[in-house]
UniProtKB/Swiss-Prot annotation:
SUPFAM superfamilies given in the database record: Methylated DNA-protein cysteine methyltransferase, C-terminal domain
Catalytic residues of the enzyme: 151
Protein name (Swiss-Prot/TrEMBL): Methylated-DNA--protein-cysteine methyltransferase
Binding site for DNA: 120-121, 134, 157
Gene this protein is translated from: MGT1
Any GO BP: methylation
Catalytic activity from the UniProt record: a 6-O-methyl-2'-deoxyguanosine in DNA + L-cysteinyl-[protein] = S-methyl-L-cysteinyl-[protein] + a 2'-deoxyguanosine in DNA; a 4-O-methyl-thymidine in DNA + L-cysteinyl-[protein] = a thymidine in DNA + S-methyl-L-cysteinyl-[protein]
Biological classification of the source: Eukaryota, Fungi, Dikarya, Ascomycota, Saccharomycotina
Family membership: Belongs to the MGMT family.
Annotated localization: Nucleus
Amino acid sequence: MKELLYYTFIETEVTGAFLVFREKTQNLVFASLGNDKLFLLGKVEGFLKKHEKQDTMYDLQELKEAETYKKSIENYTICLENKMPLPSGAIPFEFLFGTDFQRKVWNELLNVEHGHVVTYGDIAKRIGKPTAARSVGRACGSNNLALLVPCHRIVGSNRKLTGYKWSCKLKEQLLNNEKENSLSLSRL
């Protein structure tokens, strides 16, 4: 069986983003950050090939008619520019891949609020695996829904920035933007 996925690329002052939507559900299934469109396309093609199931192949096509996905694309742009925290459900998404453990971690990351950080150990405790901080870190590194699953809000036990799939510099910028916007929103 073939399943159709559509991709598009957006650019912002912060960085670019490569977005992939599943036609069947119209949900976002992949969001990667960076400014090199061809590099990101190659990454997603490799990722899909690696994760093809025996009965499912993925056909990746450029999104030509964006109307169906327009609101999700606009909301992702707002999210990327950190203009404001988005309400839950503003961008419908789903985990197309991932182990049970990874999905458990990713679902817990959804509870980390805009403008806040927690440690890998905190997440491990929250999912009932208090000694699994490193495994939580690996699950964060496997996250393919940048920003929506906010792995950028997770820091080391010493509260310092640690690795980020899309660069520690970008992680720092995203956190600083969120912090500034949270302070601005609290003054309203």
